A protein has these predicted regions:
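A helix-coil-helix interface module used to build multimeric assemblies
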Residues: 2-156
Length: 156
Protein backbone atom coordinates (compact mmCIF):
# COMPACT_ATOMS: atom_id res chain seq x y z
CA UNK A 1 0.00 0.00 0.00
CA UNK A 2 1.43 3.38 -1.01
CA UNK A 3 1.44 6.16 1.56
CA UNK A 4 -1.18 8.74 0.72
CA UNK A 5 -3.95 10.68 2.47
CA UNK A 6 -6.11 7.57 2.78
CA UNK A 7 -3.44 5.06 3.83
CA UNK A 8 -1.50 7.18 6.32
CA UNK A 9 -1.40 5.90 9.91
CA UNK A 10 -2.88 9.16 11.15
CA UNK A 11 -4.30 12.41 9.76
CA UNK A 12 -0.99 14.07 10.64
CA UNK A 13 0.74 12.29 7.75
CA UNK A 14 -2.41 12.14 5.68
CA UNK A 15 -4.89 14.97 5.64
CA UNK A 16 -2.56 17.47 7.35
CA UNK A 17 0.66 16.48 5.54
CA UNK A 18 0.83 19.87 3.84
CA UNK A 19 0.87 21.57 7.23
CA UNK A 20 3.22 19.12 8.95
CA UNK A 21 5.67 18.35 6.13
CA UNK A 22 8.43 20.51 7.64
CA UNK A 23 8.33 18.35 10.77
CA UNK A 24 9.25 15.20 8.84
CA UNK A 25 12.89 16.31 8.92
CA UNK A 26 12.72 15.97 12.71
CA UNK A 27 10.18 13.25 13.50
CA UNK A 28 10.17 10.74 10.64
CA UNK A 29 11.80 7.31 10.84
CA UNK A 30 14.56 8.71 8.61
CA UNK A 31 15.08 11.61 11.02
CA UNK A 32 15.24 9.36 14.08
CA UNK A 33 17.87 7.18 12.41
CA UNK A 34 19.88 10.25 11.41
CA UNK A 35 19.74 11.65 14.95
CA UNK A 36 20.91 8.30 16.31
CA UNK A 37 23.87 8.39 13.92
CA UNK A 38 24.64 11.96 15.00
CA UNK A 39 24.57 11.08 18.70
CA UNK A 40 26.79 8.02 18.18
CA UNK A 41 29.32 10.05 16.15
CA UNK A 42 29.44 12.95 18.60
CA UNK A 43 29.80 10.55 21.51
CA UNK A 44 32.72 8.82 19.77
CA UNK A 45 34.37 12.20 19.12
CA UNK A 46 33.90 13.10 22.79
CA UNK A 47 35.63 9.88 23.82
CA UNK A 48 38.53 10.87 21.57
CA UNK A 49 38.70 14.34 23.13
CA UNK A 50 38.79 13.07 26.74
CA UNK A 51 41.29 11.58 25.70
CA UNK A 52 40.50 7.92 26.23
CA UNK A 53 43.93 6.22 26.17
CA UNK A 54 42.84 3.63 23.59
CA UNK A 55 41.79 6.43 21.22
CA UNK A 56 44.97 8.53 21.44
CA UNK A 57 45.87 7.51 17.89
CA UNK A 58 42.94 9.41 16.40
CA UNK A 59 43.88 12.86 15.20
CA UNK A 60 41.26 15.58 15.54
CA UNK A 61 41.52 16.20 11.80
CA UNK A 62 39.31 13.13 11.30
CA UNK A 63 36.44 14.63 13.31
CA UNK A 64 34.99 16.55 10.36
CA UNK A 65 35.03 13.38 8.27
CA UNK A 66 33.15 11.63 11.06
CA UNK A 67 30.63 14.47 11.31
CA UNK A 68 30.06 14.28 7.57
CA UNK A 69 28.57 10.83 8.13
CA UNK A 70 25.48 12.47 9.64
CA UNK A 71 25.73 15.81 7.85
CA UNK A 72 25.56 14.01 4.49
CA UNK A 73 23.21 11.28 5.68
CA UNK A 74 21.01 10.05 2.85
CA UNK A 75 17.94 7.91 2.34
CA UNK A 76 20.30 5.22 1.01
CA UNK A 77 22.19 5.35 4.32
CA UNK A 78 18.93 5.04 6.25
CA UNK A 79 17.91 2.13 4.05
CA UNK A 80 21.26 0.44 4.71
CA UNK A 81 20.58 0.74 8.44
CA UNK A 82 17.08 -0.71 7.97
CA UNK A 83 18.61 -3.60 6.00
CA UNK A 84 21.05 -4.28 8.84
CA UNK A 85 18.17 -4.03 11.32
CA UNK A 86 16.25 -6.69 9.40
CA UNK A 87 19.08 -9.08 10.31
CA UNK A 88 19.87 -7.86 13.85
CA UNK A 89 16.27 -7.10 14.87
CA UNK A 90 17.72 -4.18 16.80
CA UNK A 91 17.50 -0.60 15.57
CA UNK A 92 20.37 0.96 17.53
CA UNK A 93 22.67 -2.03 16.97
CA UNK A 94 22.05 -1.53 13.24
CA UNK A 95 23.28 2.07 13.57
CA UNK A 96 26.41 0.80 15.32
CA UNK A 97 27.10 -1.71 12.52
CA UNK A 98 26.48 0.97 9.89
CA UNK A 99 29.05 3.22 11.57
CA UNK A 100 31.56 0.38 11.62
CA UNK A 101 31.06 0.09 7.85
CA UNK A 102 31.63 3.83 7.53
CA UNK A 103 34.83 3.54 9.58
CA UNK A 104 35.96 0.80 7.18
CA UNK A 105 35.43 3.19 4.25
CA UNK A 106 37.57 5.82 5.97
CA UNK A 107 40.51 3.47 6.40
CA UNK A 108 42.87 3.41 9.36
CA UNK A 109 40.03 3.15 11.85
CA UNK A 110 39.98 -0.63 12.46
CA UNK A 111 41.53 -0.35 15.91
CA UNK A 112 38.84 2.08 17.03
CA UNK A 113 35.59 0.57 15.73
CA UNK A 114 34.83 -1.22 18.98
CA UNK A 115 34.59 2.16 20.72
CA UNK A 116 31.48 3.03 18.74
CA UNK A 117 28.67 2.72 21.32
CA UNK A 118 31.27 2.02 24.05
CA UNK A 119 29.68 2.07 27.50
CA UNK A 120 26.24 2.96 26.15
CA UNK A 121 22.84 1.35 26.10
CA UNK A 122 20.32 1.77 23.32
CA UNK A 123 18.29 3.97 25.61
CA UNK A 124 21.25 6.31 26.03
CA UNK A 125 21.11 6.86 22.27
CA UNK A 126 17.32 7.09 22.04
CA UNK A 127 16.98 9.32 25.10
CA UNK A 128 19.43 11.76 23.54
CA UNK A 129 18.27 11.53 19.92
CA UNK A 130 14.59 12.23 20.55
CA UNK A 131 15.11 15.35 22.73
CA UNK A 132 17.63 16.62 20.17
CA UNK A 133 15.03 16.22 17.42
CA UNK A 134 12.46 18.10 19.52
CA UNK A 135 14.94 20.89 20.29
CA UNK A 136 15.85 21.35 16.64
CA UNK A 137 12.22 21.18 15.48
CA UNK A 138 11.34 23.89 17.99
CA UNK A 139 14.27 26.07 16.91
CA UNK A 140 13.93 25.56 13.16
CA UNK A 141 10.16 25.22 12.64
CA UNK A 142 7.99 26.08 15.62
CA UNK A 143 9.67 29.19 17.06
CA UNK A 144 10.00 30.93 13.67
CA UNK A 145 6.28 30.32 13.06
CA UNK A 146 5.43 31.72 16.50
CA UNK A 147 7.60 34.78 15.82
CA UNK A 148 5.84 35.25 12.49
CA UNK A 149 2.46 35.01 14.20
CA UNK A 150 3.49 37.54 16.85
CA UNK A 151 4.70 39.93 14.15
CA UNK A 152 1.35 39.61 12.36
CA UNK A 153 -0.58 40.18 15.57
CA UNK A 154 1.42 43.34 16.25
CA UNK A 155 0.09 44.85 13.03
CA UNK A 156 -3.45 44.89 14.43
Amino acid sequence: MELDVLTAISPIDGRYRGKTKALAAYFSEFALIKYRVQVEVEYFITLCELPLPQLKGIDSSVFETLRNIYRNFSEADAQRIKDIESVTNHDVKAVEYFLKEEFDKMGGMDDYKEFIHFGLTSQDINNTSVPLSIKEALEQVYYPLIEELIAQLKTY
